[in-house]
Structure formats: structure tokens, C-alpha cells
Amino acid sequence: MAAAPSASGRRSMSWGSSISQSFRQAEADDPFGRAASQQGHDDDEENLRWAALEKLPTYDRMRRGVIRTALLHHDGGGDGGGAAAAAKDGRMELVDIQKLAAGNLGRALLDRVFQDDSERFLRRLRDRIDMVGIELPTIEVRYEQLSIQAEVFVGSRALPTLTNAATNVLQGLIGRFGSSNKRTINILQDVSGIIKPSRMTLLLGPPSSGKSTLMRALTGKLDKNLKVSGDITYCGHTFSEFYPERTSAYVSQYDLHNAEMTVRETLDFSGRCLGIGARYDMLAELARRERNAGIKPDPEIDAFMKATAVQGHKTNITTDVTLKALGLDICADIIIGDEMIRGISGGQKKRVTTGEMLTGPARALFMDEISTGLDSSSTFEIVKYIGHLVHVMNETVMISLLQPPPETYNLFDDIILLSEGYIVYHGPRENILEFFENAGFRCPERKGIADFLQEVTSKKDQQQYWYHDQERYRYVSVPEFAQRFKSFHVGQKMQKEMQIPYDKSSTHPAALTTTKYGLSSWESLRAVMSREWLLMKRNSFIYIFKVTQLIILAFMSMTVFLRTKMPSGTISDGTKFLGALTFSLITILFNGFAELQLTIKKLPVFYKHRDFLFFPAWTFGVANILLKVPVSLVEAAVWVVLTYYVMGFAPSAGRFFRQFIAFFVTHQMAMAMFRFLGAILKTMVVANTFGMFVLLIVFIFGGFLISRNDIKPWWIWGYWASPMMYSQQAISINEFLASRWAIPNTDATIDEPTVGKAILKSKGLITSDGGFWISIGALIGFLVVFNILYILALTYLSPGGSSNTIVSDEDSEDKTDMKTRNEQQMSQIVHNNGASNTSATSSIPMSGSRSTNQQSRSQIVLPFQPLSLCFNHVNYYVDMPTEMKEQGFTESRLQLLSDISGVFRPGVLTALVGVSGAGKTTLMDVLAGRKTSGVIEGDITLSGYPKKQETFARISGYCEQTDIHSPNVTVYESILYSAWLRLSSDVDTNTRKMFVDEVMSLVELDVLRNALVGLPGVSGLSTEQRKRLTIAVELVANPSVIFMDEPTSGLDARAAAIVMRTVRNTVNTGRTVVCTIHQPSIDIFESFDELLLLKRGGQVIYAGELGRHSHKLVEYFEAVPGVPKITEGYNPATWMLEVTSPIAEARLNVNFAEIYANSELYRKNQELIKELSTPPPGYQDLSFPTKYSQNFYSQCIANFWKQYRSYWKNPPYNAMRYLMTLLNGLVFGTVFWQKGTKISSQQDLFNLLGATYAATFFLGAANCITVQPVVSIERTVFYRERAAGMYSSLSYAFAQACVEVIYNILQGILYTIIIYAMIGYDWKADKFFYFMFFIVASFNYFTLFGMMLVACTPSAMLANILISFVLPLWNLFAGFLVVRPLIPIWWRWYYWANPVSWTIYGVVASQFGKNGDVLSVPGGSPTVVKQFLEDNLGMRHSFLGYVVLTHFGYIIVFFFIFGYAIKYFNFQKR
């Protein structure tokens, strides 16, 4: 490979990483291994086949392979059957590699060549490469004097309140005046180091130390707003010389995937897009050298390597390798899912995120917190496999782990310890303890080294590791550690290496990738089109629902505009036809509105793929554009076919098809417009608000609401810029230039020869037939422009959002003077056994107060009742999933828990442990009463009495695995709110607040007191901060029984230690605490008193005490014949999971569940359960006088307090609401400027009627749509809070409705003042206040209707689709497009049922119901305005009282339906 590489040859050549993301290692040997030197395993047939292969031209030879005949007839499935059959059948055949690369044949070959030993297989590959002297490309990554800074607001100025949002806008417009509290935060500070190939590096550090920032910097994925200095090079080359996004792979800690795709489909897509790199060129060179040297490789290894070099297929054998390596093969064909779609588990999603990057050809891997949600055994196997890639295939890998167990830690070669932006240590793992011992700190026995490293730099944890008895402890700061490292021998060696520049000429030509994408543009488009088509099929319900909705609307509209009621030939007849055409047009436009939400939903995954260079952004845009063309064809065809002849439009085939063309192009234009808006606005709340504003502008200047002749000169450009005007013009010309409208015009005021042209001219439309095609051309122009803008937005706009927490002023000061401050001491827990056997008290330890420095404060003592929880023979069943039925399962239900018995006692900390899928969370949900579906069998008692859920909710706490909190409140507000509603009403306000402060100090959230919670992965708190908040929210409830589902998952070792100290202290107060736990370190695991161990299938295999150093657990399992003894210092938790794994069970031929059921331990547990299932003498069943801790009034006040604060800190919702109100008012005011001062003609009155209709409908509709995402997010939080028994559903509904009413009143006042003055309505008090009332009332019922739809549907998306069905109906029967007297009698009831019609009635009747001005009527005699309203519109001033009452009625009805649905509809499936 000395020659200059081709374009493909310059790609990253990590064929090894894509070939073999391998299996967890078992103990089986590979009976099929072959030496590279051609020993005597070849038979004559194999030689003949190989000789035939060698005679083929190079191109054909690379696409053919020789494999055993048995594999060709194997059905795949990965069960090893193909390997076994192939071992018996030695016949060989020549096969097409294209067929081998995908499908069952490839999986059978995979089973055969791997044999569950990834290292051995990789070494066979490496031996083949080394035999012909090919050098694998390697990458060395250097970073020198790298510093990264961010400019951020700190303290209260950083909170996104409405005032801060307004201040930010003003500062952006007029510049900064005075201090803005924006400060420079150092994320990384002058760090340097070398990440070497063939060495696996572990990155450790506490939260906010800069780990993710360092990884993003090294992979070229930093936010452009950050200030960066220093150099980063790959093999001496800077980022400008290659593409770091493809040379390296960054595995993010956030799991962003398409929920509707399966695991296999997700990895197939990433593998297809990332390409094969230089794998094909390397393989061709390998084959050439082997041929010249007369070397014959193992045919099946050869076929396998060729299969991995096939590019562009929908699936590839490398996907199956990755699935096996990450343990995802068991869920390969299950959809990933999300919060609304049931899919794979959180740990499996994390592995999918890792697998996405492993399928590509990158040879430098940077993996950020890949173990979150995984048990320690799975983490060990995955890291071990990656270590094989590093050591055998010379890859470069850096991995950050939160809580690496010792056995995983020992797999790494180098350690980087990062803290406060400084590198404390970077060098070999063997020397790091020596470094800290030189500084005076030693890792204790039975303490994980990784845990020690993350705690030793912390002020609050450092002192416990000081071991110099002769010297007094002194806090060693992080900068001092960093300085000490520079003088340490490892640091000095690193500095010397950094001084020697890397020889760029020695860089392997395939090491750095110089092509931007893995596929050609055409192949990328095909791949994305295939993926988007798959997503459309998976979301087919949405498209079917939209068509069904369109059919219903078409039926309703064609019965309103029935041809028997639609005479033609006069100008007045034309008005009704214009109404029918306009309604059709509005329906088509509204139908395109759903594209807004569909686009925004796809953006997070798109941005990830775009930034990782999966494909060019334009391919995603073009794919979505092309795939929506059939949607427009179907929906336009459905509407036109159903309505055209029934409504009585011009009976001509040509005009029928021309209307279809107009509606098709309009629908395409609408979807393009909303796609573009979604791409630039990015969030549902902002996009919904602005989308409705754009729709309003398009509608106002569409040519129907106000004719061109009546538009003010300063707005005439808006008329020509409105796409709806061209649509209106096209369909109007198509209709009114038909022969039946060619009747001579008799109206002298309009100078046109025919009635049809007179109608067109009265609306300011073109009167020639050529205008139709001009309008179609203009619409196509809009369509093209919107699509181009959409693609440009996708290409150049950043994702937006921030995952940074707010830095408090105090925290900022702390970091400045940290060296000079003394450590604050944590006060000890105070135990109080209480005055009786059935009561106890708790107190919370306080850390030193900032304000008083080291002065301790008094502790709050709150009473609680110790309780034991017993469960006996518990079983849990769910309906058999559809996927399993399709695979042949015949049972009607699936058992998830099988005969589980146990007891949780006061003062005993119990660990609930098991591998993923063992049923830990399921059991906890069952015991806590959180299951919403399925069948539960068995006995559950609380201190001897049957558990009553309502009572149990009052005295229990549940820290869920997913941290669900209201995003727009602060940490302190979240905790105070929980305490307010869950502590007894006897606790006064001051005591409650002090208790909250103590809990916050206990879990170290006091520094984050005023930080916004935010949305996970988008804004606000980090994962570990959010986890601590979850625990604090439950602790302030002062519960007797606490369930914690993986409280340490997602936390680093130090944060996990903080949490476990908190948990231990809680148990010591006499509470009953049980925790599920995934990957505990030794010290965390041994902080538990008892263990309940589950195996897959929900069966108990151990329940009992751990004992000192876990000796009771170890003795129990070591007594089982064949179980290997635990080695000294090994983590008992890891050992326990390994020796009880399904593989170990199969090897020992035992069933640990049966062994436990027949053990003495089981009998003792049954005796204990029997004892505790009987109430103690004199003990009464737990009961409370009220269902909730607080009365209904207090619940309402607390809920309103939280909602008010949440709304105040939600500018994207409320600031946008008021901004759009202001813009709407100004637009209406200037378009209809002083139209209300003089009404002399029918057109004047209809202009005002149109203004009233549009002013009411569009802003109200915007409120209805934009409130839905807000309510949907809060509803998820509501489900958790309701399950905790915090409040009644009605108090929650009342509070949310009240806060909306307040904002709506202010919105209505602002809107009324603007448009009332600018339009020029009569300034009389009664008219003004009537107008204001109807506007405010309409905003309220629109908003409540949107809230009601969310409460009645499982998702905001479905509610949004329903809105697009209801709003056109309200629009149709509002009394504007068709006035009430002209509505067919069979639909007139809907006019009275339509709230919008009542609002228009109220506004028009209150403003003009007593108007005595003379009104000229075309074709009729003059009349007064009052009489015209009564005769033609059916509106009377005397009816206003009923109109007012009806508005109150709608508000009350919508509120009560919202409250009822919130209470009785539960769409959370658990």
C-alpha cells in the first residue's frame, strides 16, 4: 500500500472495529480455528473451489467467497446451529458476498467464525494481516495547552424569567448598559496530554469537571459559542487537514434515537451511512499480497472479511457483530421506544447509542458515560471487548465511566483524572496511587480505586483518605494537585513526549479521513429516503387519521354547501361559492399544519446525524420533501373527489382537474412552509405560536377576508406576498370563468361583461383565464423557495438548547477563593428512638451554613411511624405482547414476577439486585402500587395489615428511575412544593422551610438552590443533579417506607457516595428503605444490610443478610457445587451476578431459583414473613382522618404557587404569547385602520365582521395549540405526584386553569386596547367592556379547550391532530364564511354549539346592534345597520345577556371536562 491511496483509500481504515464488535466471552473453545500457515485441514474440494476463486479477476474475486455448504441452508437466528452443522458437513461452495453480507446466511457465518471468543477471533484477523506485512493505521491524539471558556449569566440573572427574557432582548437591540452579571467560566484550564493508540484510556472526574467538554473538543464537536485556545492534533495534523467527525467517533451520553425504529434498523442505518472506510482497499491489498506469496487464508475468515467490506446495503453483517458484542441481539427486532411508546430498556438504549458509532470505520473512539443503566457485568464485558479492539487492532480509545467497578477499572491502560477543569493525573494506571500517596492520600482496603480517585479531590471527602499520622491534614486544592503532577515522574515524562513533535510523514495514509461522508450523495439520499419511508410506515396511523379527518370534514362541508342549496348566476350566489372555496382552502392549509410538529419531532436525531456526518443535510430535506408528494396527492384527491360535484362547482372535467392541481400545489406549499418554520423555530411552543401568526398573516391577505381594493397602501405588499391569495385566485378563476357564470352582468357599479368576471373583480382578482396558471406558477415558486429555505435551515442552523445548569453567585465566588477557605464539616446524624415502640423521630444532618461559615444550626425533628412491609407469593402478569405472539407464543399472558416473597423492615437497608430484565423495577412498582395495568397475585401487608394504597401513598416515598420534575421551577421550589403538600398540616411554615434547607444540604443541593430544573438532556440540571433532586423531593415527605429505583444510576462515584450516605442516614432513623441497584461498588454494596436477588423471569435466588464483607452471601453461593470461589478483593456484587448468570446456570446445570426455594434460608424467611404478617399486640391499622396531608384549599394554593412560578420562568411560552398578541394587534390595527369609524356600505360591515372573526379565531386558536405541549409536560409530572398522594386531581386542574386565566386576562386587555383603538370602534364604556369581555372569554375557552384535548388523549401530537380537525369546523360554523340564516337547517344546531360563533355574535351585536347609520346594499334598498344585522345575520343587541352567560358556560364546561379527564384518564402504562 505504498502507492498513493484512492479517494476511498483515504478514508479511516478501521475494518477491525466494524468487523468485530464482539460477544461477551464464554469459556467455550473454537474448534474451527485455523493457523495462517495452511496446515492440513484443507480437503480437495476446498482446494478446487479456492483455485476457481483465484482465477477470477480482482473485482469479481473480491465479491466471491468459499464457505461450507451447510451454512447455505441454515436459517440463521444466531443459535449456533449453523456452526454445528458446518462442522459435520465439510463440502464447500462458491458464494456471492453480496448475499452473504446481509441476512441469515451472514449470521450463520458469524456464529461459526466467532464461537463467543472475540479476542481469539481478532487475533486470527491480525495474524492474517501481519503475515503479509500490512501495517494497520494508528492515530495519536494530542492536546496542548487547551483552555475552554464560556460566557454565562450567573445567579438570578440566569433564570429565564419574563423580565430577564425582556432584558436580554433589549440588551441585544440597544447594547449593554451597566453590569449584566455575565461572567467567564473556565471549563478547561491549560490542559495537555497524549491519547495513544493501542492503549485504552479511562477518563474520570466528578460532575462539571469538563469530561464531556474535553471529549467534544478532541472530536471537533464543541459549541461555537465557547472560547477555545490551544492546539489539538491527530498524528500531527490539525482539524483543517481532515474530517475529525469521521476520523473519530464520539459516543454521546444522551440517547437520541427514532423511537419507531428497531435496534437492528437503527444500527443498520448508522453502519450504512458511516460506510466501510478504507476496508475494501486494504482487503484488496491483502488479497494481492497473499496471492503473490502463495498464502491461502482460512476461506470462512476471508468470506467474513469480504462481507464487512460491502458498502451501501440496507443491512450488513457488521450490524450483527455489534449486536452480539453489546448484548443487543436479544432485543434486535424490538423498537427502541420513548416515553409514550413501549420499547427497550434504558440500559439497552445506552448500548444502542454506543453501537451506532461502533458500526462505523472510525479508529479513534471517544465514549462518554457509556455504562449508565448497565449492570456491572455488562459494563465489564463491553469494556473488555473494546479493550480487545484497542490491543489487537491498534485502535485509540478514551472512555469516561461514572462508577467503574474494580474489574472494569483494571482493564484500562491509562487514566486521566479531571477535576475543576484541571488535569490532576494523566498516565499509566499503575502509577496513579503512587502519585496520591506522595501527596499524602491512600486508598483504603475494599475501596474501589476509581471511587477513591473521584472523591480525593473533593473538599468534603478528601480528609478521610489522609494517612500521614505525623503531619496534620491540610486541604490540597485541585490546582495544587495539577502542579504536583507536573513534577511527578509520569508528568515529567509526558512533558518530554509533548516537546517532541509528531512526525507527520509517518502517518498511515488510511489513518485520517479526508472524505466528508461515507457514501456518495446519491447513496446517502437512498439511505435517508429508505429510513424516512420506514418511519412514515411506522407512523401510518397519523396519516390515516389525517385522511379520515379530511373525509369527515369533506362530508360536513358538502352537506353545508349542498348543490341543491347552491344556485349560480348572480353576484349574491357567488358570495356563497366564494365561502365554499375559501373553507376548502383553509382546510387544506390547516391540514398542512401537522407538518410543523412532525418536523420538530425529527430534529434532535437529525442534528445528531448531521453533526456526526452521517449524511449531507440536504438529503434529509429532499427525502422528506419527495416522500410528502404522495401525501399531498392523496389528500387533495380525497377532498376534490368528495366535494367537487356535491357542492355544485362547475360541471367540467377540465375544471375538476384544475381544482385538484390548485389544491395539490397549495397543500405542498403549506407543508413546505410549515416544514421551514419547524426547522427554524425548533420547539413546539414557539413554533405553534409563530406558526399560527404566519397562518393569520397568510389568511388576512388571502383575498377573502378583505379585498385588494380595501387594503391600505402600506400593506399592499402583504397581499402580493400571501401564498393564499394565489390559491384563492386560482380556484376562484377556475370556478367563475366557467360557462355557467358567463351571464351578462347587470350591476352598473362593476365594469365587467359577465357575472363571473364581476365577482372576480369585486374581490380584486384577475379576470382572465391565464391568471390561473400565473397563480399556479406563483404557488410553485413559493413551494420551491420554502423548500430551499428549509434545506438551508437544516444545513446551517445549530440545534439550540443548553444542558448547562445555572451557576450561583455564591458558587462562582467559591471557585475563586477555594484555596483560602477551610473545609466545612458535616454534622453527624442525631438518632432519637422515640417515646414508644410504634413511633420514632427523624432529624437531618446539617452542613455548615454559608452565612455563618462553620456554625452549626439546630436540627428539625419530625415524627414518623416505623413500618415493615411483607409480601408473600407475589406474581405479576401482563398481556402477551403482540411481537411475542407473532413469534409463536400461544399463552394469553406473560408472567414477569414468579412467586416472590420477602420482607422489608425498619432500620434495615435492603438492596434489590438483578441483571437487566430480572424484574427489579416491576417488583418495586407492584409493592409501591404504581402499576396501572396487569394482574397482581399474592399477599402484601404493612405491619401485619393488608396494604391500602391510599394510606400507603401517604407514608411512602418512591424515587423513580426516570427523574420526572417540572422543568420551569428551581431546585428549591421543587423541594419546598413537595414538603408543602406531603408533610402533615401540623408542621408550620418555618419548620417546613428549615426542614427543606436541611434536606438540600444533606444531598448537597444547597449550591444549586436557585438553579432551574430544566428538561433532561436539553436544559437545566445534569443527570446526577437531577437524581439528587429526585431523592430530596421524596425525603422531605418524611416517609416511613422509601423505594429507590436505581438511585445511583447515572451518578459518578462521589455523587453515588453522597446519595448512599443520605440513604444510610435515612435508614438509621428507623425508616424502611429498599433500593434497586445496577452496578454497585464494593463500599456501596456493603453499605446494605440485606439483599433480595432476582434472576431473569422474576424469580428470587437469594433473600437474606449480606454479613460483614458480604460473607453470608458468599458462603451461600460457594456452597453450591461447581460455583467458583471469590478471589480476594473482588467485588461480591459482580461475582454474585457472574456466578448466577444464565451462562453459569447452563454450565453447572442448576436452577438457582429452585436451590433457594429448597434452602434453609427460604424457610427462615417464610417464618419471618409469617411473624411480621401478624399485627403486634395493641397495634392499630394505619389510618388518616383525611385522604391528603393538606386540605383542598391548601392544595389549590400550593399548586397555584408552583404553576405561577413555572409560568413566570417560561418565556418561550408566555413571552411568545404576548409578543404574538402585540404583533397580531398591530397587524389587525394597521390593516383595518379606522374601519370602524364609518359604516356606509355592506362591504364596510363585512370588512369589520371579517376583522372580528379573524381577530377572535386566529389568536384564540394559537392559544389552544401552544398550551398543549406545556400541559403535556406537566401531565407527566402530575402522574408521579398523584401516585405519591400529594393532592387531588381537581386542585391541580384548578391551579393550572387559574394561572392560564390570569395570563389570558392580561393578554386580552393588551389585545383589546391595541385593536379597539386602531380599528376605531366607538369609544363608549359599555361597548369597550363588552368587547374586552368577549376577547378575554374567547382566549380562555380556547386555552381550556386545548388543555381538555391533552387531558383526553395520550399524547400532545394526537391532541394537535384533533385540533386541526376541530378548528376548521369552528371556522366553518362561526357565522362568517356562511352566515347563520344560510346554514342548512340540519347543521344550524352546530352554529349554536360553536363557541366562536357566540363570540362573533357578541362582538358584532355589542358594537353595532344599536347602530342606526344607513347602509347601502348592492342590489337592494338601503337599510340601517341594526336592521341589516337582524335580517341578514340574525344578530340582536337584546340577546347579549345570553351570549355573556354562554361564554361562562363554555369556560366552565371545558374546565370540568379537563378536570374529569385529568382525574380518570391515565395514559401512563406501567
Swiss-Prot record:
Residues 523-736, 1194-1408 form the ABC transmembrane type-2 domain. The chain crosses the membrane at residues 541-561, 577-597, 629-649, 660-680, 686-706, 772-792, 1215-1234, 1249-1271, 1301-1321, 1331-1351, 1359-1379, 1389-1409, 1439-1459. Residues 1-47, 828-852 are annotated as: Disordered. SUPFAM superfamilies: P-loop containing nucleoside triphosphate hydrolases. It comes from Oryza sativa subsp. japonica. Disulfide bonds: none annotated. Residues 832-843 have a biased composition (Low complexity). Keywords: ATP-binding, Membrane, Nucleotide-binding, Repeat, Transmembrane, Transmembrane helix, Transport. It is found in: Membrane. Pfam families: ABC2_membrane, ABC2_membrane_7, ABC_tran, ABC_trans_N, PDR_assoc. Residues 172-445, 869-1121 form the ABC transporter domain. Coiled coil: none annotated. Belongs to the ABC transporter superfamily. ABCG family. PDR (TC 3.A.1.205) subfamily. This is ABC transporter G family member 48. It is a multi-pass membrane protein. Its main location: membrane. ATP 2 binds at residues 914-921. The lineage of its organism: Eukaryota, Viridiplantae, Streptophyta, Embryophyta, Tracheophyta. InterPro entries: AAA+_ATPase (IPR003593), ABC2_TM (IPR013525), ABC_trans_N (IPR029481), ABC_transporter-like_ATP-bd (IPR003439), ABCG_dom (IPR043926), ABCG_PDR_1 (IPR034001), ABCG_PDR_2 (IPR034003), P-loop_NTPase (IPR027417).
